[in-house]
Regions:
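Secretory targeting and sorting signals
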Residues: 1-24
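Beta-strand-rich domains and repeat architectures in extracellular enzymes and scaffolds
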Residues: 32-62, 71-81
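Surface loop/turn motifs at the tips and blade-to-blade linkers of beta-strand repeat domains
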Residues: 34-41, 68-73, 115-122, 170-176, ...
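Signature of short aromatic-glycine-proline-rich micro-motifs recurring in repeat-based ectodomains
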Residues: 40-45, 74-80, 125, 177-183, ...
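Structural motif
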Residues: 55-56, 66, 95-103, 144-153, ...
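Blade-loop segments of beta-propeller domains
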Residues: 62-99, 110-119
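Loop/turn-rich, solvent-exposed surfaces of beta-rich toroidal or solenoidal domains
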Residues: 175-227
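Conserved blade-ending motifs and adjacent loop-strand segments that build the rim/top face
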Residues: 221-252
Length: 280
């Protein structure tokens, strides 16, 4: 949830410039390289959209929120997700008492689905991850949590945008997870997640790449998940300060994992990166 931190960095635009080092040890996920991540329109996350007429990578950022949605109070967009040609952007609001998912169908048509918050539910809507069968939508809240939320996939399993998108069930990790910025399925029973955890007490490492092995495919009832920390994501910049790990994407076509990491201070503009990994 980097909107305030990013806005402050853009306003101040001052930092101490020093050489940076990429300290990443993410187990079998080996760095293949990186691409510049623009601060305004590539700072929240990304999704690989695969369609018969062509495939593309779609990013989200603070400048990609449609004006009409911003006017309705949807003031933050998270890490998007995609599967079977459907593309989903997650939105949150400080005042609407709801979350919104903006969905583009394979034919290019857009719809908006609103979920009214449950009494126990946080307002955060950090990411959207679609199950491999296209039937379920997974999202996450901010802070330390013992759940990921699952909804019927809007546009596929739930097709009435004018009705409340219902909460369906949860993924229940066997270990608390903190500040999850993005998740994506690598199979029907495995998620990879990017965590912006700056404390490090949960897994002994800050800013980790997490692996969640599910007890079974999503099928309409709670599933448990074994959580493993695979190591710290790369933190490389010419500036000192606090990095922000953002969203992620797994491209099932070639096994490429991409994770956005925004740089500290002024360098948020100059050397933020989308890191590319492959499993060795």
């Amino acid at each position: 949830m980097g909107r305030k931190a990013l806005a402050a960095a853009l306003a101040v635009a001052i930092a101490v410039i020093v050489p940076g080092i990429a300290n990443a040890d993410t187990g079998a996920w080996v760095i293949q390289g990186s691409d510049h991540a623009r601060a305004l329109d590539e700072s929240q996350g990304l999704a690989t959209v695969i369609r018969p007429n062509g495939s593309f990578i779609q990013y989200t950022g603070i400048s990609t929120i449609p004006i009409a949605d911003s006017a309705k109070g949807w003031n933050h967009v998270g890490d998007p997700g995609s599967r079977l040609g459907y593309y989903v952007e997650p939105y949150q609001s400080d005042n609407n008492g709801a979350k919104m998912f903006r969905v583009q169908a394979p034919n290019g048509a857009w719809s908006e689905y609103t979920h009214k918050l449950e009494s126990w539910e946080a307002l955060n809507n950090s990411f959207a991850a679609v199950s491999p069968d296209g039937q379920w939508l997974v999202s996450g809240e901010w802070g330390t949590m013992d759940r990921l939320l699952v909804y019927p996939m809007p546009g596929v399993r739930f097709t009435t945008p004018n009705q409340n998108l219902p909460y369906a069930f949860a993924i229940r990790p066997d270990h608390p997870i903190n500040d999850i910025q993005g998740c994506d399925f690598t199979s029907s029973t495995q998620l990879l997640c990017s965590s912006d955890d700056s404390d490090g007490t949960l897994y002994g490492v800050t800013k980790p790449l997490l692996q969640l092995d599910l007890s079974g495919p999503l099928n309409g009832a709670d599933v448990t998940a074994h959580v493993s920390a695979l190591g710290q994501l790369p933190l490389q910049s010419s500036c000192t300060g606090t990095f922000e790990v953002e969203g992620m994407d797994y491209d099932m076509r070639d096994g490429t994992l991409r994770v956005v990491v925004m740089s500290p201070g002024f360098c948020v503009l100059t050397d933020s990166k989308t890191w590319r990994f492959k499993h060795s």
